[in-house]
Regions:
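Single, functionally critical "micro-switch" positions that shape active/binding sites
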Residues: 128, 172, 308
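A general secondary-structure junction signal
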Residues: 110-114
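Residues at or immediately flanking beta-strands
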Residues: 105-107
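DPxDG-like acidic metal-binding loop motif
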Residues: 125-146
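A glycine-rich phosphate/pyrophosphate-binding beta-strand-loop-alpha-helix module
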Residues: 122
Length: 357
């Protein structure tokens, strides 16, 4: 008997505003974008699991679950401890523990190719681990007959993601993948109470955006750990910067929610300047030379710019308020060494489809 294959996918994210300050309770703006992690799961009729994770530079794994739901690798699995593999196993451990390990054996396939440069193989920084977490949790719960609501999916995914990454990060990328569309996000008071964590927003009329890749990948973990050290060693200075960032982020969220594109464009460079203060205080490079060069190109073309996410490398986003400037920005960037990314926002209702084949 052939069992049906369950398929789902989860979006990446593009952070528009609120990086770093979101860790201290500030609101952030984030969009779900059309780069997808695809997950397929199919019952195999046995008690063992086979897992293939394309694009993650790791071998196929064979495992079973013990009574607590913990992954036990088969003796012939060519596994050595590696962050991507460890993270993936922790996510599976989390889901399996919810069912006390009583999950029938299956073949699981994961494809995160959308999140990597096709030529260099470098990661863009569009939230691949969050998308993987959301898609895998959605698929495994569907496999067990549980169709999670968006709120339940977010709650489960943020717990699993933090288990896999040592409680690092705000969860903003998980929120984008689970919710879809454009959202204003604040870190929930607890993983059990997410009632006020997400507000949905409509994209303002007359606001245009362009996404660009710096050409290099950055380590969000490294950046966050340096900021955390600054928080511990210079708490007063740290909180003075965070307070400014929070105030600017709140202004930006209000402008975005009210459809005031002009005000939002004033907020973006103000936030960038606070990121400059933060990087100088922490000894990190948020606005790397590549980000600075892109910023100069965008400003000369009439727009505003900031890194999207932790900075250092990865992605940046340019904004403007008219189509002519939007085209000028794109033309100028096409003549630069940097890669334009054709990203579109995925509406909430289209972000997490389930299909049976």
């Amino acid at each position: 008997m052939k069992h049906p294959r369950i398929s789902t996918k989860a979006t990446g994210k593009l952070i528009l505003l609120g990086e770093y300050a979101v860790l201290e309770g500030a609101p952030s703006l984030v969009a779900a974008i059309d780069r997808f992690c695809h997950v397929h799961i199919q019952k195999n009729g046995f008690s063992i699991f086979g897992l293939e994770a394309m694009n993650l530079d790791m071998p196929d794994l064979t495992f079973h679950l013990d009574e607590s739901g913990k992954v036990i690798l088969a003796g012939n699995s060519p596994y050595t401890s590696e962050k991507r593999t460890d993270f993936l196993i922790e996510v599976i451990n989390y889901v399996a523990s919810r069912y006390e390990g009583k999950i029938p054996g299956a073949y699981i396939s994961i494809d995160t190719g959308d999140f990597f440069h096709r030529t260099s193989g470098n990661k863009f920084g569009l939230g691949s681990s969050a998308a993987l977490t959301v898609a895998l949790i959605r698929a495994m719960n569907e496999y067990m007959g549980r169709n999670l609501s968006a709120d339940a999916l977010f709650s489960e995914a943020i717990k699993a993601h933090r288990a896999g990454q040592g409680r690092l990060g705000s969860g903003v990328d998980i929120a984008a993948s689970a919710a879809g569309g454009v959202i204003e996000y604040v870190v929930p008071g607890s993983e059990e109470d997410i009632t006020n964590a997400i507000k949905r927003h409509k994209w303002p009329d007359g606001l245009y955006f362009t996404s660009v890749w710096t050409g290099t990948s950055a380590s969000t973990r490294f950046m966050l750990e340096k900021v955390k050290r600054f928080r511990l060693t210079s708490p007063d200075f740290y909180h003075s910067i965070m307070d400014e960032m929070r105030s600017i982020a709140e202004d930006g969220c209000r402008a975005f929610a009210s459809g005031d594109a002009g005000k939002f464009l004033e907020v973006v460079p103000a936030y960038l300047e606070q990121e400059r203060k933060l990087e100088a205080a922490c000894g990190i490079e948020i606005i790397s030379p590549s980000h600075q060069k892109i910023n100069d190109i965008v400003r000369n073309a009439g727009g505003v710019y900031k890194p999207s996410g932790a900075g250092g490398g990865d992605i940046g986003v340019a904004f403007c308020d008219n189509e002519e400037t939007h085209l000028n920005i794109q033309s100028a960037l096409q003549d630069s060494p940097y890669d334009l990314l054709d990203l579109a926002i995925v509406p909430a209702e289209k972000g997490l489809p389930i299909s049976y084949e």
